[in-house]
Amino acid sequence: MSGFEQLFAGKLPKLIMFDLDGTLVDSVPDLAVAVDTMLAELGRPIAGLESVRAWVGNGAPVLVRRALANNLDHSGVDDALAEQGLEIFMRAYAQKHEFTVVYPGVRETLKWLQKMGVEMALITNKPERFVAPLLDEMKLGRFFRWIVGGDTMPQKKPDPAALFFVMKMAGAPASQSLFVGDSRSDVQAAKAAGVACVALSYGYNHGRPIAEENPAMVIDDLRKLIPGCLDMDAEILLPDIKRPSSRESIVVVTRKLWMKVIKALARWRWRA
């Protein structure tokens, strides 16, 4: 039985929100290159791929601090050093994504969901400036109507603010929404928003099995959400889902747009 059949009683959700790193793409090799470049410039021993794999998932500033501490616990890292390290890291990571790859089954699943008219959003803790170029390189951007970066809003996952914002934009209640991620912060954000969370077992969760976070379901291939699993021609009973038109297919939620939303809400509250 597919994930959708188990979680939504034979229907599709109206909205699916995805994490990026560790869920749709394996970006650790390029992140590790940038981290090691930063450490080398600061005269510190390089970390290596596996250490970086255990540190990712909470955004670039936290990743840099963990690398400087050589530990998940980064409380003792000097703020000035962290700022310097972050600047070097951001410069190094912006250069290219030579080693990042899309996980097996991701493109097929996104194509199928798009074909079925499901609204999709991307909510990542990756800094906004890196998201669009990476999606372009991986040829994934066209699938998402809403894209929210880690510094787009004042809060990032595990805070559920981005999930609430996207659900509001999509007109989708929590009962018809799904979050797909790979880490503790993803599961916590989904639970805080009242949304079911499907977790990928192959992602980044600081070396801990994601099942320990008690998501609604754990899968090892995104295609297992689909009825018939690997059958891309499968059909399923749909709730009343409106297929988005091509001209309104993508809305990148930038910091500038978010501030406009905040101001509009403030005006509405004042008038009320």
UniProtKB/Swiss-Prot annotation:
Its cofactor is Mg(2+). GO terms for molecular function: metal ion binding; phosphoglycolate phosphatase activity. Its EC number is 3.1.3.18. CDD domains: HAD_PGPase (cd16417). The keyword ATP-binding does not apply. Keywords: Carbohydrate metabolism, Hydrolase, Magnesium, Metal-binding. The active site is at 19 (nucleophile). It catalyses: 2-phosphoglycolate + H2O = glycolate + phosphate. GO terms for cellular component: cytosol. SUPFAM superfamilies: HAD-like. Pfam families: HAD_2. It comes from the Bacteria. InterPro entries: HAD-like_hydrolase_sf, HAD-like_sf, HAD-SF_hydro_IA, HAD_2, HAD_sf, PGP-like_dom2, PGPase_prok. Pathway: Organic acid metabolism; glycolate biosynthesis; glycolate from 2-phosphoglycolate: step 1/1. Specifically catalyzes the dephosphorylation of 2-phosphoglycolate. Is involved in the dissimilation of the intracellular 2-phosphoglycolate formed during the DNA repair of 3'-phosphoglycolate ends, a major class of DNA lesions induced by oxidative stress. NCBIfam families: HAD-SF-IA-v1, HAD-SF-IA-v3, PGP_bact, PRK13222.1-2, PRK13223.1. HAMAP family: GPH_hydrolase_bact. This is Phosphoglycolate phosphatase. It comes from Pseudomonas syringae pv. syringae (strain B728a). The lineage of its organism: Bacteria, Pseudomonadati, Pseudomonadota, Gammaproteobacteria, Pseudomonadales.
